[in-house]
Amino acid sequence: MKEQALITPRTLSGFKDRLPQEAMAKSRLLRTVSEVFEGFGFVPIETPHLEYAEILVKQGSDEIQKELYRFFDHGGRDVALRFDQTVPLARFISQHRNALGLPFKRYAIGNVFRGERAQRGRYREFTQCDFDFIGSESIGSDAEIIQVIYASLKALGIERFTISMNNRKILNGICDYFGVKEQTSDVLRIIDKLDKIGEESVIKELVEELGLSQESARGILGFTSLKQERSSEEFFAKVASYEGLSDSLREGMGEMRALYAILDTLEMDRACYKINFSIARGLGYYTGIVYETTLDALPSIGSVCSGGRYDNLTQSFSKERMSGVGASIGVDRLLAALEELGLLEGRGTSAQVLVACMEESQLAYSYKVAERLRTLGIKSEVYPEAVKPKRSLAYANSKGHPYVAVIGEDELKQGVVTLKDMQWGDQKPCISIEAAAEILLG
């Protein structure tokens, strides 16, 4: 019989496995931000990975639609994998409107899919962690989303970051002034590439793709290059002369002033949030304030949290107008950044202690010790074989167990354990399980 050829184990480009250490780091990150969300009153929901294509296609930009994983299923239905969690949220809200009270604050954590070029910090399957405030037109809800971004990054131990903010109404207004109102979506799509391709390439695309004059292209880019360098008061004074250019621009600037009236009263570091008129957000459903968050130490990795207001998102599903504002944390990109910054804990186990014995006759007692420790609130793992301490300690060291509870003949007879601190090498011989638990909880 011909020997069957072995399959080479491999993953697709842009898709990845996670070894325990990385998977645990991701789990800790998600637990941390979930606690922040719930501290603001957000509740979890879940939506399917697979949606009818028509639900996703209408709301995504042209660029997003090119990256969509779309196919016909076995039943001949035109379906697609979700590219974000905001469009499924619009469908969810419209479908379950009667079961939800408004305003509704939700968060959702799950994988999304985009067929973009894979590179550092960018994957084709990646986890998004979204939080949204539905049913409120108040600028206060915009301010709260920004507050949640700030609190989440601080909870993860990140001190220096910048939340760059803009308003689509301001961008719409400047496009109107330069006579390209009908091409606003295309103009914003190209401006959104500014950090990726640079000023001259943006001007070239505006001129060659959209037919703008050099004067209009440079005028739009000149305005979008304005950034807040110092206090908000100085910046608003600097751009006040632009407000007369259009009603939309004036309205957008008024909203930014109202936003700052709230943000500046909070105990947030003002260096962490600034206005940047080049922030456009490529997704077509944003209608008001938009923002992107970059890490000051790693700006090249891109935005780790972005979002904005989308007052018309449910219009494809319902005649009822539904306001919303939210943001999305790019979990995989943020994990890559945290690793590069040395902020990820390096343990490969969740257990606080490894229980290990030296003789087969002591194995049952090992499981009893671990059971008792768990009832006392200690995450405990049992080494499943009787081995010499050198071997069990090497295992604990490789996995990152902080402590090892060693069981030998004396420990079995007395109903105690010997507790070894793996970091400092200290050892507490023959102490009670309760005493060991106190040290472990310590």
From Swiss-Prot:
Gene Ontology annotations of biological process type: histidyl-tRNA aminoacylation
Entry annotated with the keyword Aminoacyl-tRNA synthetase: yes
InterPro entries: aa-tRNA-synth_II (IPR006195), aa-tRNA-synth_II/BPL/LPL (IPR045864), Anticodon-bd (IPR004154), Anticodon-bd_dom_sf (IPR036621), His-tRNA-ligase (IPR015807), HisRS-like_core (IPR041715), HisRS/HisZ (IPR004516), HisRS_anticodon (IPR033656)
Reaction(s) catalysed (UniProt annotation): tRNA(His) + L-histidine + ATP = L-histidyl-tRNA(His) + AMP + diphosphate + H(+)
Keyword Amino-acid biosynthesis: no
NCBIfam families to which the protein is assigned, alphabetical: hisS
Protein name: Histidine--tRNA ligase
Organism listed in the record: Wolinella succinogenes (strain ATCC 29543 / DSM 1740 / CCUG 13145 / JCM 31913 / LMG 7466 / NCTC 11488 / FDC 602W)
